[in-house]
Amino acid sequence: MSVRFLTAVSGRAFNMHDRFGREIDYMRISVIDSCNLNCYYCNPQDNNKNCQVINTLSVKKVLCIVRAATRLGITHFRLTGGEPLLHPQIDEMVSQIKKIPGVRSVSLTTNAVLLAQHAKQLKEAGIDSINVSLDTIDASEYEHITKKPLLHKVEQGIDAAIECGIRVKINVVLTPQTDVVALTRYASKKGTDIRFIEMMPVGEGHTNGVKPYEKVIGALLEVYGTPCHIDTENREEINSGYNNADNGPAEYYSFHGLDIRVGLIQAIHGKFCDTCNRIRVTADGRLMPCLGSSVTMDLVPDSCEFTDDLEKDFVIVQALKAAIKAKPGCHNFNDNAVTYTKTTETKTVETKTTELKAAEVNAARNMSRIGG
């Protein structure tokens, strides 16, 4: 075995930077691409395909990916879906990831429908935090959004996680109908931070048009007065008593009378690409350097055969390096200056090449196919 190989897989982990100088230390892993809800902005066809298990990452494969990632200095891992609690071994997966040297935090994003029955096991497995996707606390509106009358299950899940001592945050995808004040009061009652997320201009989100700062801060200002912006660079102050797992894109605000933080995640109106620190693995085992791009890369080609785990680690490390180096400087969600080339076969032997604007490509994508 070569010296270079030994160094790559058994040497001390180092900090991995992309070609724009950003340190990449955070990985989101979509462990399954099916979901037990059918949210209109995620699955606009209004069918039940979200419930079908198409791709699932095995525990063994996830552990291989995490081990390789830690060798590149990636230390924070978030498990997503689809709905990750549909994965039959999700509790075991969390437990095994936590045992890998170099892992600083493991978190999970869920719709919380199944959280009540998993909360205790996840706590015992060592989960560091859970983000709950919840867009309304009105039962009829919840059913309208998700096509399922399951709000009570979500609330039970949130309560169970909090009772187990798990740090919970609430994520809200902003729409024109979002009741900002009601959701913030609910989060405050539960003692959980809340983050309002700008909908990506993908699929149904292409025509959403809600400006997060105006909608959220404007609504809360009328009730709680002028907010105080929290310096997101001062992580030690913000996360006093917490781990450093939420070193993400949220801008946080505090309000008089609220003992929680209110966060905004604005992919378009508060573009944060220059500080992006993450990379994504899809449920079919591919690497996605950026959500704003339809480009994905092979993690481990199916044709690869390995003599041992060390060799497999080396291949995954090299794939991760390539994906990080390919990470674009910024997303192009609404950029008509960026084009993709689409090649299709015609009825004859000839092929047809079409130039598509990035904004057109994103408008045609389904959010459910991107991953959580």
Residue ranges of model-derived segments:
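Radical SAM enzyme [4Fe-4S]-AdoMet core and its adjacent flexible, acidic
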Residues: 140-143, 148-263, 267, 311
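Radical SAM/AdoMet-radical enzyme domain recognition
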Residues: 56-79, 83-197
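Canonical Radical SAM [4Fe-4S] cluster-binding loop centered on the CxxxCxxC motif
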Residues: 19-59, 72
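Glycine-centered loop/turn positions within well-structured domains
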Residues: 37, 139-140, 271, 297
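N-terminal [4Fe-4S]-dependent radical SAM core
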Residues: 2-30, 38-40, 250-261, 265, ...
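Flexible mid-to-C-terminal extensions adjoining Fe-S/redox cofactors in radical SAM and related proteins
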Residues: 268-372
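Residue-level signature of catalytic and energy-coupling elements of molecular machines
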Residues: 31, 194, 285
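Secreted/processed peptides and extracellular or luminal domains of membrane proteins
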Residues: 41, 45-48, 213, 219, ...
